[in-house]
Design a protein with these regions (language model features):
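Short, Lys/Arg-enriched N-terminal segments with co-localized hydrophobic residues
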Residues: 1-7
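Donor nucleotide-sugar binding loop of glycosyltransferases
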Residues: 22-25, 60, 115
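Short, well-formed alpha-helical segments that are part of the catalytic scaffolds
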Residues: 22-44
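Conserved donor nucleotide-binding strand/loop of the catalytic core
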Residues: 50-54, 65-99, 137
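A conserved acidic beta->alpha catalytic loop
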Residues: 54-65, 112-113
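Acceptor/aglycone-binding surface of glycosyltransferases and processive sugar-polymer synthases
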Residues: 83-85, 89-99, 104, 116-187
Length: 187
């Protein structure tokens, strides 16, 4: 386990982006997230924040790694990690968390199902409410086939019944965490 406490950078948000075959989506995501950070730099409560993007290529076969490398050429705030094969989203997220140096760390999908526009609101909730983490959940399944929505709801209900955990329907990996929370996850 890589411990980054000594290297933590105050007022920095690290964005961990696990990617598997996201060659087409990654440039769109990058444009959107940089737009959000540019907007945040104009607002008084977030003006001093900087960011780093940590793109974790989970063994993609479509050129995702080439796109990630290209992004690092023009933006020193972008880093990438490359896996030799597909180890799964959780392994990619964990590797990204291990390399994140920000005082705050977010996990976001590159396919824009996690709206980057929510990041300022999530940051505000983290700061004003004193939370260690702010998570998201999907409230609507518009555009998804009815049969998939049906089985997703059934899955969450069943898992809540057979486990001691309350499984929230539509819970997402998209979250913003403070350093204390991230370090606890990694320990």
């Amino acid at each position: 386990i890589i411990c980054r406490v000594a290297g933590m950078e105050k007022n920095k948000i690290s964005i961990v982006v696990p990617c598997f075959n996201e060659k087409e989506a990654l440039p769109l995501f990058y444009n959107k997230i940089t737009q959000v950070f540019n907007q945040m730099s104009q607002e008084s409560e977030t003006a001093g924040l900087s960011y780093e993007l940590i793109i974790v290529d989970d063994g993609s076969m479509d050129g995702t790694l080439d796109v990630a490398k290209e992004l690092t050429v023009n933006d020193s705030g972008v880093k990438y990690i490359s896996f030799s094969r597909n180890f799964g989203k959780e392994a990619a997220m964990y590797a990204g968390l291990q390399h994140a140096v920000g005082e705050y760390v977010a996990i976001m999908d590159a396919d824009l199902q996690d709206p980057p526009d929510m990041l300022p609101e999530m940051y505000k909730a983290l700061m004003e409410e004193g939370y260690d983490a702010v998570g998201t959940r999907r409230v609507t399944r518009k555009g998804e086939p009815a049969i998939r929505s049906f089985f997703a709801r059934k899955f969450y209900r069943l898992m809540s019944r057979i486990s001691k955990a309350n499984m929230v329907d539509g819970a997402r990996d998209y979250r913003l965490m403070n350093r204390k929370y991230v370090d606890a996850l990694l320990s």
